Each structure stands twice: as C-alpha cells, then as structure tokens.
Amino acid sequence: MILDRDLNLEQFISVVRHGEQVELSAAARERIARARTVIEQIVEGDTPIYGVNTGFGKFENVQIDRSQLAQLQHNLIVSHAIGMGEPLPAEVVRGMLLLRAQSLSLGHSGVRVEVVELLLALLNADALPVVPSQGSVGASGDLAPLAHLALGLIGLGDIEYQGQVRPAADVLAELGLSPVQLQAKEGLALINGTQLMGSLLALALHDAQVLLGTANLAAAMTVEARYGSHRPFQPDVVGLRPHPGALAVAAELREFLAGSEIAPSHLTGDGKVQDAYSLRAVPQVHGATWDALAQAERVLAVEFASVTDNPLIFPETGEVVSGGNFHGQPLAVTIDALKVAVAELGSISERRTEQLLNPALSGLPAFLTPNGGLNSGFMIAQYTSAALVSENKVLSHPASVDSIPTSANQEDHVSMGAHAARQLRQIVANVQTVLSIELLCAAQGLDFQQLRAGRGVQAAYEYVRTFVPTLTEDRYFRPDLLRLRGELVSGELLRVAQAADTQAPAPAKLPDSGDEDRDTTSRH
C-alpha cells in the first residue's frame, strides 16, 4: 500500500491484520520535507517556538539553547514513557505505527522523512515496540503510549519480534536499521497524537460491523426457533419510522428469513398476539447500533486524514501554530456512544436466549435438553451470558465525561479517550461471546423443528452442525462455544448465511392478503 493522503478502514485492517506492506508516496515525502525546512529555519533563529526550542507543558516558557535541542527531544521521550499495565496487543501497536506514520506524512509536523520511514520499517518487519496499555488521559493525545512506541525508534525499551521480546537496540541491529537520533521537534511530533485511541477504535469498529451482521443472523435464527413472526420486519412496518439503521437491519432479517417453511406453518392458531420486544423490535434496537457504527465510521474517516500534532507547521507561510488538534474528545465521545450501542447487542441477545431456554416462553423443552433433570442443558450458558451483559453495563459508563487536570493545570481538560477505547474493545469481546451463546441455543432450538428455516438461517444452522453436534446429553461444551465464537469473530458464519441469500432464487412472495391480514391481527 502506498501511504498518501487517503486511508480507509479496509486498508487499515489489511495492513494491521493481514500484513500488507506500506511505503511512502513521493508526494508524502515532499510534504514531509517542506515542513522540515520550516523547523530548520526556526532552529537557526532565536524566536521561541513551543516544543522546538522551549520546554513542554508547564515548562513552555523555558527557552532551550540551540546546542541542547536534540537532548530536549530525547529527554521528552524517555521521561514520558511511564505507562503501566499489560502490553497492548500486537494489532493495536501495528495500528499505532501506521496511523502515526499517516499523520506525519500529511506534512504539518516538521519531522525528517527518515523518522517516518523508520516507523514503516518497523511496521513492515512486524517488529513492534512493547507499549503498556495504561497511562493515556487522551490529551495531549496518547502521550505515554506513543512515547513507548517512540522508544523503539531510538533504540531503547523492548521490541517484540518473531515471538520474542528483546531489547530494541538488538532488534534494530538484526534488521539492519539504525536508531534515529531525534532532532528539533521530532520527539514531540512522535508522541503528540491520538493514535492509540484511533487504532483501538478502528479495530473495534471493524469487529463491531461483523458483530452487527451476526447479531442480525442470531436474531433471525431465534425468531425461527421460537416460531416468531416475520411481519414486523416488512418494509411497510419499518418504513413508518425510517431510521437508516432500522431499514438496513430489517432488510437483512428478511434476507436471512426468506424461503422459510416455518413462518407459514404458524400464521394462525398459536394463540399469540405479539412477540416479545427482543424478537419484534430487532430492527429498531439493532438499527440504533447500525446508526452508531455509521457515525463512528464517519468520525474515523476524518481522523485518518487528520494531523493531531502540536504545534502545527504551515510550510506555505512558514507559520507555526499551537492548536488543540491533539485533543481526543471527538474520538472519546464517539467511542462512548459506540460502547452503549454495542453493549445493547449483547443485552437484547441475552433476552432472546431466555426466550429459547424458558419453556413457558418458548414451548420448547426446558433449557433445550430432551431429558431435563438428569441433564441441565444450556442452563448455565445463560449465566455466562448474563454475567458478560452485566459487566458491559459497567464498562459502558462514559469515560469522556471525566477529566483530571494535568501538567500543573496547563492541560486542564482531557478526554480519557484511550480509557474509553480499551473499554470498547472489551465490550466487543464480551458481546462476541454472548452472541455465540445465543447461536448455540438457537441452533439447538432448530433441532426440534421439522421444517426448514429461512435460507440464510438454515445455511448457518447446517454450518454450525458441521462442528458442534446437537446436545442430547450434558457434555463439556466450552470447546464448542469457543469454536463457534471463532467462526463468529472471523466473519465466516456470517459469510455462509449471506452467501445462501445471494445464491438463492428470488424470495417467495408474502402470503396472500387474507393470510397477511390474519398474521397482522394475531401476531403484530
């Protein structure tokens, strides 16, 4: 991939998860060099410019002698690399390297080209500085985590390479790379940015997009296992409140349910007036998550194309301006909203699991076991689901409403965006498990059906049964859950269901008007 002005989520994932190599475009090199020229001119003069020839934070009024400018940048990195906690996952660090290089390549930071090239060299070699997960307050950007990232460039700290954590200097030498000797402004440019929260958001957003599609599939499977009505998902119903997300979710539900033999079998005579909200209101609940994901993708697209440094260099005029582009609030607020939206996918999924396991609601054997009492079936699977849903409620508390002033009150409002982003990552992981539990239960519920489900649901059900057998007697089925969860996370289960829809003949017509009226009267 050629790194220039444009970077999208698909490209980000291709690099961070699939190892696509990255190089700077010629235009990016030129932009970087022009901004560097401005810094070199400043160094030759005596005008105090923040972060170039002054101290940092509360020390902004301390002017630094020209002979100490390189030491100033070195000191900045080593003093700020004070993060704690478990190391960030490899994919998160890859994302930080890519996004920092992307921001610097826009040509408003004043670094030399070789600094950006070293970032990309580490990324392409998958030689990843060890970055602790805790220590960012989200303004000025992700200072401590990015300082740990920068340590690797100057040959300090540790780098994980080929499965081993080793001193950075040793890994650089093995790769034939030289540690960079930071010059004026370069240390500050490396650590002033939102790349930790940006990387975490990008990864979580991608996973949440897959998660939403799978949540729609799980809901459709539960609707079929529970003899639920399809009528609330029809365009005339959802179209009366046409939020984009609700329309999109309803359309996908109709695709998964098309061709069902189950729905026509219970249009009348089952005694139900309407389904529970967790079945009937899936377009509205999942649709709200769809809308939140769409907004997050818009915010992320802007962030990918942004310069989050301070001060900013304007090569056309030679101006150097202190601004607030480093502040993480645009991301933090978006992430907090996404936390709630994704957590709700788990909350409603757990309620659908209850609809499957409770015989008073489902008409199916209690806990989906044919021999209850001796066997407990899926009873405790719901406990796990409930525990994770409850945990998500705590994690969903907004981090961006909190702020603790830092740097002697010079930096008096911060975003806590990285904290929110780490919470979002955990929420996504928890919901992946909650939905896997629903899918296990829904597949078991379909085992009691004699008719075929909608094409997408049926394909997913049959695929699940290739690696998870029907539960006839109690067994240790955590491995089954883990395997199914893996298929969910990879997106393979969703692809199977979607492929069945695209390869199928045109969906069958809805029942004749008389049947449709009966369905509306008895089930809506």
From Swiss-Prot:
PROSITE patterns according to UniProt: PAL_HISTIDASE
Catalytic EC class: lyase
Cross-link type 5-imidazolinone (Ala-Gly), residue numbers: A139-G141
Gene that encodes the chain: hutH
Species the sequence originates in: Deinococcus radiodurans (strain ATCC 13939 / DSM 20539 / JCM 16871 / CCUG 27074 / LMG 4051 / NBRC 15346 / NCIMB 9279 / VKM B-1422 / R1)
Predominant localisation class: cytoplasm
Name this polypeptide is given: Histidine ammonia-lyase
Native organism taxonomy: Bacteria, Thermotogati, Deinococcota, Deinococci, Deinococcales
Pathway where this protein functions: Amino-acid degradation; L-histidine degradation into L-glutamate; N-formimidoyl-L-glutamate from L-histidine: step 1/3
GO terms for cellular component: cytoplasm
EC number(s) reported in the record: 4.3.1.3
